[in-house]
């Protein structure tokens, strides 16, 4: 079997292999649709999915015309990247050319997507599809950070509190997106906007989300989500039955500045872990880190069993005190950044 988690990089390859080798997994055509935001937009439109209006463009001039037609603000997107890369929110015409170049650079396509900017609350929705039907649905709160070009997801929380009517509409729109894309025998992850009981599916991936989502699903629902993904890929029977309900949340460890990790207080890190904190550090001392621009700039993560963001943030501060960038404590660096 073959599957992936948290990235679109391998999804098309997985679809191709599953098709050629008759394995359990995402169909190749669905994989191609769900790794190209423009193709996805076309499929959603044809499938009646509630989504933002958008247009495919091949030049800055076409992007300008599309933005004028859609009405500002718009979002200019690289069509073949995930993790908020190549995405810019554009407020006026003077920003279009730079946004277009940001989207085109690093893309294997000769077009980008210009999309109407939606207002509302951004949430995440993960699920699992079997026999073309959603058999598991997990909406969750999304923590975002406003980057240079767009908002960047930096964490998630379970459960997402909402009315029964809103949950039903989320499920309905997700199923429409699944049907429109042809996704099957795979996990899905969607960026969703809600306003009252109105739901828009911004985009959907044919794999589970990143930023600790599988770990949080496992913690909240009481089953190992990674195990169920692997079982599905192997063609084995899966079980998404919730066995417990443990509120939990996570955030990425990030740096607002580029530099080198000069010190990690390993003794304190171990004490925090012994207290029950789920703490992962990606890099050792001496490793260079980048100022956060998207989720790939993470230097670790923290998971806490709580329903209070303030409690998570306090634990994040304790971890940041353990890390030094270019001789300065990371908690201090963040305090100086937010004070500006």
Model-derived regions, located:
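Conserved N-proximal alpha/beta basic substrate-recognition cap immediately N-terminal to
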Residues: 1-56, 65, 298
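Short, well-ordered beta-strand elements within core beta-sheets of diverse protein domains
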Residues: 88, 116, 159, 218, ...
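Short, flexible turn/loop "capping" segments at secondary-structure junctions
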Residues: 76-80, 150-151, 292-297
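Glycine-rich phosphate/pyrophosphate-binding beta-alpha loops
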Residues: 84, 205-221, 285
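Active-site nucleotide/adenylate-binding loops and adjacent lid/helix of ATP-dependent enzymes
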Residues: 33-113, 119, 131, 160-176, ...
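Phosphate-binding core of ATP-grasp and ATP-grasp-like enzymes
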Residues: 103-111, 116-160, 168-201, 205-213, ...
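Peripheral (often C-terminal) accessory segments that flank ATP-dependent C-N-forming ligase machineries
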Residues: 230-340
């Amino acid at each position: 079997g073959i599957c992936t988690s948290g990235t679109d990089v391998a999804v098309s390859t997985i679809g191709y292999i599953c098709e050629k080798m008759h394995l359990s997994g995402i169909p190749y055509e669905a994989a191609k649709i769900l790794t190209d935001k423009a193709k996805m937009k076309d499929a959603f439109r044809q499938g009646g999915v509630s989504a933002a209006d958008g247009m495919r463009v091949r030049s800055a001039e076409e992007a300008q015309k599309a933005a004028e037609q859609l009405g500002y603000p718009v979002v200019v997107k690289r069509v073949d990247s995930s993790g908020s890369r190549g995405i810019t929110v554009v407020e006026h015409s003077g920003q279009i050319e730079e946004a277009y170049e940001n989207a085109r650079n690093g893309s294997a396509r000769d077009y980008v997507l210009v999309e109407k900017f939606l207002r509302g609350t951004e949430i995440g929705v993960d699920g699992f599809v079997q026999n073309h039907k959603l058999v598991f649905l997990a909406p969750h709160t999304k923590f975002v950070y406003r980057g240079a070009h767009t908002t960047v997801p930096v964490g998630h929380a379970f459960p997402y509190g909402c009315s029964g009517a809103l949950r039903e509409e989320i499920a309905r729109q997700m199923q429409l997106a699944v049907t429109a894309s042809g996704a099957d025998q795979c996990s899905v992850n969607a960026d969703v906007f809600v306003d009252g009981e109105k739901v828009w599916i911004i985009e959907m991936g044919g794999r589970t989300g990143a930023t600790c989502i599988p770990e949080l699903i496992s913690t909240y629902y009481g089953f190992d989500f990674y195990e169920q993904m692997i079982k599905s890929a192997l063609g084995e029977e899966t079980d998404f039955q919730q066995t417990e309900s443990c509120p939990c949340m996570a955030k990425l460890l990030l740096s607002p500045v580029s530099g080198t990790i000069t010190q990690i207080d390993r003794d304190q890190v171990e004490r925090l872990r012994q207290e029950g904190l789920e703490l992962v550090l990606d890099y050792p001392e001496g490793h260079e880190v980048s100022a956060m621009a998207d989720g790939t700039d993470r230097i670790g993560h923290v998971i806490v069993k709580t329903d209070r963001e303030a409690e998570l943030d306090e634990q994040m501060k304790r971890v940041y005190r353990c890390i030094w960038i270019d001789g300065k404590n990371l908690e201090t660096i963040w305090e100086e950044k937010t004070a500006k």
